[in-house]
């Protein structure tokens, strides 16, 4: 029997209740809010992706208008060689040789976005990527902006970039 050695660090949700106290639910230490508050505050949820073999995906729980920020990464920029996270597929390249580590940020809900690849479009599983990653500096952050209007219930899809599959 194989023993699961995965450690999940849980913390209390960072949201306040209506009475001003702290929410009693827990969340992964890398996400500030529990599922219910992430849905209320960010208008997003994480659940099983519609794409086969893609694990979880990010879903809109409210409509987003074209150009609106849907999700973001905000963490320190590190050199890829210094960071093991780039091997997991959750690092977002901000410039050549540098990434933002989506696994160590509390606003990294964008890390759950999958890519709508051509074969998935042809099989009508998705209709193309609906957000684009935009990097800004001082401080470094990556914003996922809507390429078109997104309806509540839509899965969020972003292009991983040309180099992503070349490196795999």
Feature roles, as predicted:
Residues 2-8, 25:
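Short, flexible, mixed-charge glycine/proline-rich loop motifs
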Residues 22-26, 35-36, 46, 72-73, ...:
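Intrinsically disordered, low-complexity regions enriched in proline, serine, glycine
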Residues 12, 33, 59, 63, ...:
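Beta-strand cores of modular interaction/reader domains in eukaryotic scaffold and signaling proteins
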Residues 41-133:
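Catalytic cores of histone-lysine modification enzymes
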Residues 6-10, 117-168:
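C-terminal SET catalytic tail plus cysteine-rich post-SET Zn-binding segment of SAM-dependent SET-domain
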Residues 11-40:
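Cys/His-rich Zn2+-coordinating "finger/knuckle" modules used by eukaryotic regulatory proteins
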């Amino acid at each position: 029997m194989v023993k699961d050695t995965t450690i999940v660090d849980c913390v209390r949700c960072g949201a306040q209740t209506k009475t001003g106290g702290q929410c009693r639910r827990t969340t992964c230490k890398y996400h500030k809010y529990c599922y219910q508050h992430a849905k209320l505050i960010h208008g997003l949820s994480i659940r099983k992706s519609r794409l086969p073999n893609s694990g979880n995906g990010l879903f809109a729980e409210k409509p987003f208008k074209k150009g609106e920020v849907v999700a973001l990464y905000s963490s320190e920029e590190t050199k890829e060689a210094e960071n093991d996270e780039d091997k997991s597929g959750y690092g977002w390249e901000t410039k050549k040789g540098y990434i933002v580590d989506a696994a160590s940020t509390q606003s990294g809900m964008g890390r759950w976005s999958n890519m709508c690849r051509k074969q998935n479009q042809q099989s009508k599983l998705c209709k193309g990527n609906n957000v684009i990653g935009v990097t800004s500096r001082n401080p470094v952050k990556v914003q996922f902006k809507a390429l078109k209007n997104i309806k509540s219930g839509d899965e969020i899809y972003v292009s991983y970039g040309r180099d992503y599959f070349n490196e795999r």
